[in-house]
A protein has these predicted regions:
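Active-site and donor-binding regions of nucleotide-sugar-utilizing enzymes
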Residues: 1-128
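Conserved catalytic-core segment of nucleotide-activated headgroup transferases in glycan assembly
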Residues: 10, 125-188
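Active-site regions of enzymes building and remodeling cell-envelope glycoconjugates
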Residues: 16-22, 37-38, 62, 115-118, ...
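Donor nucleotide-activated moiety binding/catalytic core segment of transferases
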Residues: 32, 183-227
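Hydrophobic/aromatic beta-strand patches that form the interior of the parallel beta-sheet core
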Residues: 41, 65, 96-98, 119-121, ...
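C-terminal amphipathic helix plus adjacent low-complexity
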Residues: 264-321
């Protein structure tokens, strides 16, 4: 069951799943899976209708696999008022959650009652994510906001100030250096600081013309790191970070030195970034292959439980870390 706007989560890997696959995009509170259903897969745990459908599956003893669609972000997880009480995996509604990396597994399983709920899969859509090196001779920093930059008035003021400061220093820097700053930010932020946003372009297109990235906490960080681009984290809110970066900007005074280093990154910080990426994103093997293996094992375990008339239980780790 899925929201069609997030169809990139259900990419080529779904074609490699054995058996018949049906997509359900319209459903209400009373939706239940058909009797022949072996597994329900969804990322949609943010709406009352989809949460009710998941609960119906659990009651019917139908296994449910939840897909994580990106990084955890502290304010989104713990401060935002969500439409449903469960918010962001609080609790994890399904039998298993396909996490994007080892650190996400650790953070979530540190919460009481979550141990054994998480599997380290990765992000299948990044399996073949490659960009061509920029052909431009002019170094360029891509500046990114998250899709929903703030969740309160305090947040809004701090985040707008961070982009106001960054725009000011970027303009001054550009007067003395042959560099470019591209802004992949929300329309509101773009209007406040007086720049054009590339938010409607594909991320791949923006990254192909970039040398480095400055981003709010966002999955964009991992996508840029995955291409070996130096990435700085912009966050004036001083929130805990579930994904680490080698460069962090938490006040105006840190911006200039960070820009200088992004254009000439120290090797030690690049090593740190590579290690942080490997912890935040499963990249040891194909995420698509791990997802298919997880799905197959869950179906197999479910079938065996039904055949033996036993309660549905899954091992703490199905595919290993």
């Amino acid at each position: 069951i899925r929201n069609p706007s997030n169809s990139n989560l259900y990419g080529d890997w779904i074609k490699n799943v054995q058996g018949d696959v049906s997509f359900v995009t319209e459903f209400g509170f009373d939706w239940i899976p058909p009797p022949e259903c072996s597994l329900v897969i969804t990322h949609d745990t943010y709406r009352p209708e989809s949460c009710a459908a998941i609960f119906n599956c659990i009651k019917k003893n139908v296994p449910v696999l939840i897909l994580s669609d990106g990084i955890l972000e502290y304010r989104n997880s713990w401060i935002q008022k969500h439409r449903v009480d469960s918010g962001i995996f609080n609790p994890i509604l399904g039998h298993k959650l396909a996490c994007i990396g080892a650190s996400q597994v650790r953070f979530l399983e540190s919460i009481k009652g979550y141990f054994g709920k998480c599997e380290n899969v990765g992000l299948p859509r990044l399996d073949d994510f490659k960009i061509e090196s920029s052909k431009s001779k002019i170094p360029s920093i891509l500046v990114c906001s998250s899709k929903t930059p703030w969740f309160s008035d305090d947040d809004k003021n701090q985040i707008l100030q961070s982009f106001i400061d960054l725009k000011e220093i970027a303009c001054n820097y550009g007067q003395n250096h042959t560099v470019k700053f591209n802004w992949r930010i929300s329309d509101h932020i773009a209007s406040v600081i007086g720049v054009e946003t590339s938010i409607r372009k594909s991320l791949k297109e923006d990254l192909q013309s970039s040398t480095a990235v400055i981003s709010m906490p966002s999955t964009v960080m991992l996508e840029a790191m995955y291409t070996s681009m130096p990435v700085a984290l912009l966050d004036y809110t001083l929130s805990p970070h579930y994904v680490q970066a080698a460069w962090t900007v938490s006040c105006k005074e840190q911006i200039l030195s960070t820009i200088n280093e992004l254009f000439n990154p120290p090797i030690a910080k690049l090593f740190f970034q590579r290690t942080a990426l490997a912890d935040a994103l499963q990249i040891k093997e194909s995420a698509s292959a791990r997802m298919v293996r997880l799905v197959s094992k869950m179906v197999e375990i479910s079938y065996r439980s039904r055949s033996l008339g036993k309660p549905l239980r899954f091992p703490h780790r199905i595919i290993g870390m």
